[in-house]
Design a protein with these regions (language model features):
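Solvent-exposed loop/turn segments at secondary-structure junctions
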Residues: 32-35, 83-87, 118-123, 149-152, ...
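Catalytic-core regions of hydrolytic enzymes
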Residues: 52-131
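Soluble non-cytosolic domains of exported or imported proteins
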Residues: 53-61, 90-94, 155-163, 207-215
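A short, glycine/acidic-enriched catalytic loop
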Residues: 45-49, 121-156
């Protein structure tokens, strides 16, 4: 277990400072082919179970919504729509990590890197969905995942990343108390050692529909965007 005091992290606040007028946030997808339960008009040619290369229906579409929502808050956002996990799932983190490094080299003003995914919740062949209790429409939940140095590998930024995650979680919880799942800390780095301000964000699960994920990420962005805009200097 990793000892964490949420109250202390909230009191510290995020270490992240976003530069004005330059690219600030990168959204990308290590597993871009991750898709959702087909429903309504959101039917897609599957390349594997709940996966598709069609960016109209996979997590890249959800990334488009997040990028636009954050941009509406005045943030400078880049969205890498490249599919790094197809045709080979193996090595996708190596490929996406190399791409992140290229972005950091090209845009040194970047301060936040979001690797946007959808989760997979299964048990005994039963697929589960996440549900935010909202009055108007079905909506998935969102989870922030923070890698640590618990594996012994180099990762000097994980506590700063956690401070950012706690800051965002608090901002979203204030507006939508059921939207966020608990923050998850893991032993693995998931490329988050490459730069400060790195987070994995999981929107929904394979049991959710695309529209449920879109509603969730839009609500997340509408709260997280203004919170991030307050970090611009």
């Amino acid at each position: 277990d990793i000892p964490v005091s949420v109250a202390a992290l909230l009191q510290q606040g995020p270490a992240t400072v976003l530069p004005a007028g330059e690219p600030q946030i990168l959204i990308m997808h290590t597993h871009a082919s991750e898709a959702f339960t087909p429903a309504g008009r959101d039917l897609y040619p599957a390349s594997d179970t709940c996966r598709t290369e069609d960016t109209n229906y996979n997590i890249v579409h959800v990334g488009d919504v997040l990028a636009n929502t954050l941009a509406s808050a005045g943030l400078q956002v880049l969205h890498d729509r490249t599919i790094y996990d197809y045709p080979s799932y193996t090595g996708s983190y190596n490929r996406s990590g190399a791409a992140v490094q290229e972005y950091l080299n090209q845009y040194p003003s970047l301060r936040i890197v979001i690797d946007l995914h959808r989760d997979a919740l299964c048990s005994d062949s039963v697929v589960y969905k996440t549900v935010a209790e909202l009055p108007d429409a079905a909506c998935s939940q969102v989870m922030l995942l923070v890698g640590t140095n618990a594996s012994g590998l180099y990762h000097p930024y994980w506590e700063e990343n956690l401070r950012l995650a706690v800051y965002l979680q608090d901002a979203v919880n204030a507006a939508h108390p059921t939207l966020m799942r608990p923050i998850t800390l893991v032993n693995e780095r998931y490329n988050q050692h490459l730069t400060r301000g790195s987070l994995i964000i999981e929107v929904g699960s394979s049991g959710n529909t695309l529209q449920e994920a879109i509603r969730a990420v839009r609500l997340f962005g509408e709260s997280a965007g203004p919170a991030l805009a307050r970090l611009v200097q």
